[in-house]
UniProtKB/Swiss-Prot annotation:
Keywords carried by this UniProt record: Metal-binding, Molybdenum, Oxidoreductase, Periplasm, Signal
Protein name: Protein-methionine-sulfoxide reductase catalytic subunit MsrP
Subcellular location: Periplasm
Positions of Mo-molybdopterin binding: N88, Y91, E92, C146, T181, N233, R238, G249, I250, K251
Family annotation (PROSITE patterns): TAT
Reported modifications of this chain: Predicted to be exported by the Tat system. The position of the signal peptide cleavage has not been experimentally proven.
Signal sequence, renumbered to the chain: 1-44
Organism, as annotated: Erwinia tasmaniensis (strain DSM 17950 / CFBP 7177 / CIP 109463 / NCPPB 4357 / Et1/99)
Family in the record: Belongs to the MsrP family.
Cofactor(s) the protein needs: Mo-molybdopterin
Its biological purpose: Part of the MsrPQ system that repairs oxidized periplasmic proteins containing methionine sulfoxide residues (Met-O), using respiratory chain electrons. Thus protects these proteins from oxidative-stress damage caused by reactive species of oxygen and chlorine generated by the host defense mechanisms. MsrPQ is essential for the maintenance of envelope integrity under bleach stress, rescuing a wide series of structurally unrelated periplasmic proteins from methionine oxidation.
Length: 334
């Protein structure tokens, strides 16, 4: 596989400081304006990130053992960890980007199990200990592009999803892979209260074609910045597909099913004209209400330092993944 790492010093960026075009999407779909408004405290907190004011401390996770394959490393200074762990999209804990860090401590991950079923010869149920014993972890520095128009670069720790799927031995009927987030309203307040969770249908679900899931770039991610994922980043295990928009990166996964037909996905069900199943990063296919031709790389400087730059096809991974979509109309299959 040809390694592509089109990164510059300005590409290593913090978790987005921008609030929620998607919040606006929900509002325009007719949901409660009160649930979608940005509180003054959160707005002030947003400005403090740009001004370099007080920030929450970085989440303190368990250090992980991992290798660092050279083709996935960028010799660049990473943005402080507290920005990645303190500003997140995870609607199960609220709509504001500060909500997950504030409220995700209710998530219980100690006895986590992940089930692999469906069109497989060997269904599996694995604990996180099983996963760490069976699958060697490695750090990969990946670009991440949000559908909202911002991007960053994150040092994930994880392993190739394809290795887990191979262990389950997919049958010849398997064509797609469906993913499910934990459904636990007692732990995830957004699942219990539509006002908090934006009115999404929970649990959050996502999907990939089998060949996308088997691609070597596709990760099941267990850590960030060398430590176990904190709850707000999708602990204890999440999906990372670097050539797709960030909403494909489903968090806190409890079930992976290999299936015959294209599975439903949360944002596509909510607004199919705005969020496609494929969700490949594509500067030539705009969101119905904003351009995807450019993006904001969010750095550690002030708000005046935030500048737009061209969005790369497949988020810069075209040499590695474009062949998956040969002959497919990317405008129709967005």
């Amino acid at each position: 596989m040809k390694a592509v790492n089109p990164l510059t010093e300005n590409d290593v960026t913090p978790e987005s400081l921008f609030n929620a075009r998607r919040r606006t999407v929900l509002k325009m779909l007719g949901m409660s304006a009160a649930a979608l408004s940005l509180p003054g405290a959160a707005r002030a907190d947003l400005l403090s990130w740009f001004k370099g004011g007080d920030r929450p401390r970085a989440a303190s996770g368990r250090p992980l053992d991992f290798s660092q394959p050279q083709q996935f490393q960028a010799n660049l200074p990473l943005t402080p960890e507290d920005k990645v762990t303190g500003y997140n999209n995870f609607y199960e804990f609220g709509l504001d980007k500060a909500d997950p860090a504030a409220h995700a401590g209710t998530l219980k991950t100690a006895d986590w199990k992940i089930e692999i079923d469906g069109e497989v010869a060997k269904p599996l149920t694995l604990s996180m200990d099983d996963i760490f014993k069976r699958f060697a972890q490695e750090q990969r520095i990946y670009r991440m592009r949000c559908v909202e128009g911002w991007s960053m670069v994150v040092p994930w720790v994880g392993f190739e999803l394809g290795k887990l799927l191979q262990a389950a031995e997919p049958t010849s009927n398997a064509r797609f892979v469906a993913f499910h987030t934990l459904y636990a309203p007692d732990q995830m307040p957004g699942q219990q209260d539509r006002f908090i969770g934006g009115g999404l249908d929970y649990p959050y679900v996502e999907g990939l074609r089998l060949d996308e899931a088997m691609h070597p770039l596709t990760l099941l991610t267990t850590g960030v910045y060398g430590k176990a994922l904190p709850p707000q980043n999708g602990a204890p295990i999440r999906l990372t597909v670097p050539w797709k928009y960030g909403f494909k990166g489903i968090k806190s996964i409890v079930k992976i099913s290999l299936v015959k037909a294209m599975p439903p996905t949360t944002w596509n069900q909510l607004a199919p004209n705005e969020y496609g199943f494929y969700a490949n990063v594509n500067p030539h296919v705009d969101h119905p209400r904003w351009s995807q031709a450019t993006e904001r790389f969010i750095g550690s400087g002030g708000i005046l330092d935030v500048q737009r730059q061209p969005t790369l096809l497949f988020n810069g991974y075209a040499d590695q993944v474009a062949s998956l979509y040969r002959g497919l109309d990317l405008r129709e299959n967005f």
